[in-house]
From Swiss-Prot:
InterPro entries assigned to the protein according to its UniProt record, in alphabetical order: Ras-like_GEF (IPR008937), Ras-like_Gua-exchang_fac_N (IPR000651), Ras_GEF_dom_sf (IPR023578), RASGEF_cat_dom (IPR001895), RASGEF_cat_dom_sf (IPR036964)
Its job: Guanine nucleotide exchange factor (GEF) with specificity for RAP2A, KRAS, HRAS, and NRAS (in vitro). Plays a role in cell migration.
Molecular function GO labels: guanyl-nucleotide exchange factor activity
Pfam families: RasGEF (PF00617), RasGEF_N (PF00618)
Name used for this protein in its record: Ras-GEF domain-containing family member 1A
Domain (Ras-GEF): residue spans on this chain: 214-461
GO terms, biological process: cell migration; positive regulation of Ras protein signal transduction; Ras protein signal transduction
Length: 481
């Protein structure tokens, strides 16, 4: 019988290559009698009915599913059913197999069967602990573990493994809950309304150059923040992009849809960094100092690129391309823009960001062959990554004409998500500077209105449209005051 796909072999290593390992065996009875509902192509599973795919997940006496399949199916199944329903079906299949073993000649293999079920549950709870945060899932988990414990009442090996698994699960759930509570307490940077009339900033007011004047150091601290923020994103958060869009397409609201707080927080960080860059430039009074500020951020963006921190690089470029900054022609005329032009070339949106994708591929290859943590860093442009997942979902159907689930599609989505998760687990090798990070995370940022006011005060409006905008803004802010 053909085996599960090899898509993750380069990521998970030889022990998880997608091929049956010694002692793993094949799915007994042709995938539990459901092999006719599983379609393989060149040895790769490409489609199947939901029932057959669920049966393919559950071990037998002589079969254990490949880890790549476990991860992919557990991740993608939530598009079709909530985790507690899948867990309930897994429990039913376990009961059926247990009864067959008890009634047949292989009763002695019950202990081996129960150990494999516990191993499957262990992998599930480790990969997706949040699946067990609701009472329904916990009840199903307890029901399954109670049944398999009965298969090894003599020496209690299975019972001990279940106890360890449960303890680890509870610790993971507690840690995630505490992290989310902490994130929700942290306020975003204060929004500064900016000057209402032209005034010089207070002498004591700091800018980024007063905190850090080394582009490399600032790029390293930005990388620290990126890795810290992205580490709170989990595979199921990313798969919600798919399931949420299905809900919208079908005009229904998923009541069990978990808040994608981590995704929103990470997206907000990108926007805050862009606005901080624009604020730092626009609030500088002297043109010479604004020029220096722009050149500094260009150097920071270049260092981010060299590190592999494409998300911060894109945020910085986006900040410098905001209208209040981009319109400062007199300032830009003094800037040595050759390095900025190179950065914009890397982020050129033409041909679906072809240049960026080439650079990302190079960083990925460097990461795979890396000998140090520094070489392993890959932080993609998150908005583009999300769009890739979204479009991959939109251009390929969930179901084929014969009613099968298009599992080939979910292999690819899962592969991309797994690769992203690998990048998020890299330990940042740079020394942490609390002073710099505090400034980056808490420095007041101008609102869009305030940015335009500061920009116009630095370089007056040059055409009728700008003059009208400037007049309207001044009137609005004065009335508001």
């Amino acid at each position: 019988m053909p085996q599960t796909s090899v898509v993750f072999s380069s990521i998970l290593g030889p022990s998880c290559s997608g091929q049956v390992q010694p002692g793993m065996g094949e799915r007994g009875g042709g995938a539990g009698g459901g092999s006719g509902d599983l379609i393989f192509q060149d040895g790769h599973l490409i489609s199947g009915s939901l029932e057959a795919l669920m049966e393919h997940l559950v071990p037998t006496v002589d079969y254990y599913p490949d880890r790549t399949y476990i991860f992919t199916f557990l991740l993608s199944s939530r598009v079709f059913m909530p985790p507690h329903d899948l867990l309930a079906r897994v429990g039913q299949i376990c009961v059926e197999q247990k009864q067959q073993l008890e009634a047949g000649p292989e009763k002695a293999k019950l202990k081996s069967f129960s150990a494999k079920i516990v191993q499957l549950l262990k992998e599930w709870t480790e990969a997706f602990p949040y699946d067990f945060q609701d009472e329904k899932a916990m009840a199903e988990l307890k029901a399954i573990t109670h049944r398999v414990t009965q298969c090894d009442e003599e020496n209690g090996t299975v019972k001990k493994a279940i106890a360890q698994m449960t303890q680890s699960l509870l610790l993971s759930l507690a840690a995630r809950s505490q992290l989310q509570e902490l994130r929700e307490k942290l306020r975003p940077p204060a929004v500064d309304k900016g000057p209402i009339l032209k005034t010089k900033p207070p002498a004591a007011q700091k800018d980024i150059l007063g905190v850090c004047c080394d582009p490399l150091v600032l790029a390293q601290q930005l990388t620290h923040i990126e890795l810290d923020r992205v580490s709170s994103i989990y595979p199921e958060d990313l798969m919600q992009i798919v399931s949420h869009m299905d809900s919208l397409d079908n005009h229904r609201c998923r009541g069990d849809l978990t808040k994608t707080y981590s995704l929103e927080a990470y997206d907000n960080w990108f926007n805050c960094l862009s606005m901080l860059v624009a604020t730092e430039v626009c609030r500088v009074v002297k043109k010479k100092h604004r020029t220096r500020m722009l050149e500094f951020f260009i150097d920071v963006a270049r260092e981010c690129f060299n590190i592999g921190n494409f998300n911060s690089m894109m945020a910085i470029i986006s900040g410098m391309n905001l209208s209040p900054v981009a319109r400062l022609k007199k300032t830009w005329s003094k800037v040595k823009t050759a390095k900025f032009d190179v950065l914009e070339h890397h982020m050129d949106p033409s041909s679906n960001f072809c240049n960026y994708r080439t650079a990302l591929q190079g960083a990925t290859q460097r990461s795979q062959m890396a000998n140090s943590s520094r070489e392993k860093i890959v932080i993609p442009v998150f908005n583009l990554f999300v769009k890739d997942i979204y479009f991959l979902h939109k251009i390929h159907t969930n179901h084929l004409p014969n009613g099968h689930i298009n599992f080939k599609k979910f292999w690819e989505i899962s592969r991309q998500i797994h690769e992203f998760m690998t990048w998020t687990q890299v330990e940042c090798p740079f020394e942490k500077d609390k002073k710099i990070q505090s400034y980056l995370l808490t420095a007041p940022i101008y609102s869009e209105e305030a940015l335009f006011v500061a920009s116009f005060e630095s370089e007056g409006p040059e055409n009728h449209m700008e003059k009208d905008s400037w007049k309207t803004l001044r009137t609005t802010l004065l009335n508001r005051a």
